[in-house]
Amino acid sequence: MARYRCCRSPSRSRCRRRRRRFYRRRRRCHRRRRRCCRRRYTRRCKRY
């Protein structure tokens, strides 16, 4: 669950810290979290 903290909270600092991991692994996300990973973590966490 800790992996997806950035998904839940709109904290930009957390997003920046964890961005690279999520960008690399975004295709291997858990099914329930896939939407979050794709939309929020692609293209430099654009949604934040």
From Swiss-Prot:
GTP-binding among the record's keywords?
no
Q: Which InterPro entries match?
A: Protamine_P1
UniProt-listed GO biological process terms: chromosome condensation; sperm DNA condensation
The cross-references to PROSITE patterns, in alphabetical order and at most eight, read: PROTAMINE_P1
Q: Which UniProt keywords apply?
A: Chromosome, Developmental protein, Differentiation, Disulfide bond, DNA condensation, DNA-binding, Nucleosome core, Nucleus, Spermatogenesis
Ribosomal protein listed as a keyword: no
The superkingdom listed in its UniProt entry is Eukaryota
Q: Please give the tissue specificity annotation from the record for this chain.
A: Testis.
A Pfam family (short name) is: Protamine_P1
Record-given protein name? Sperm protamine P1
The beginning of the lineage is: Eukaryota, Metazoa, Chordata, Craniata, Vertebrata
